Amino acid sequence: MIFILIVIIIALFIYQLFLMNKINKTRREMGGLPIATPFPQHQRLPLSQKRNPIVVVSTTCTVCQRLFKEYNNKTHGDKITFAFVDDTSTVTQFLKQHPQMTSASVVSFYDRDQLFVKNTPLAYILNSEGYVVDKQSIVSLKELPINS
């Protein structure tokens, strides 16, 4: 009888862990702009970048550093736009230190409050009119739906 009770308690504990993991993942992905809202200053983006994923990044984010190392101009080319939430001078200095990023499409006129971003990196997928159709927390550029 005690054995069955212990097994049930362990099973409930494992179920709780899986449930909390799913809740935390959902909560993390729910940051940022709501889906179906217009992306701010979409008209300022280069015309070739308007349908590509926009990855909101920071120069101090450790996961973002991995994304920068993973970025390859031959593979990703102009298929990704990096939107930095740091000030322009910091971004300029950062790009000088990372030569592989010089050919990347980079914008730095956004701030965290404008995009409702607390944690970076966060990727936005926009439609042709500039509305957010999907968003996701990413740890690799391979997770992005890149148009060929």
Predicted features, each with a name:
Residues 68-73, 91-95, 145:
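Short amphipathic alpha-helical segments and helix-helix/interface helices
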Residues 30-35, 58-62, 101-103:
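Short, flexible loop segments at the rims of nucleotide/cofactor-binding pockets, characterized by
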Residues 40-44, 102-111, 136-137:
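Short acidic-hydrophobic, aromatic-tinged amphipathic segments that line or gate anion-handling sites
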Residues 78-109:
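Thiol-based oxidoreductase modules, predominantly thioredoxin-like and allied folds used
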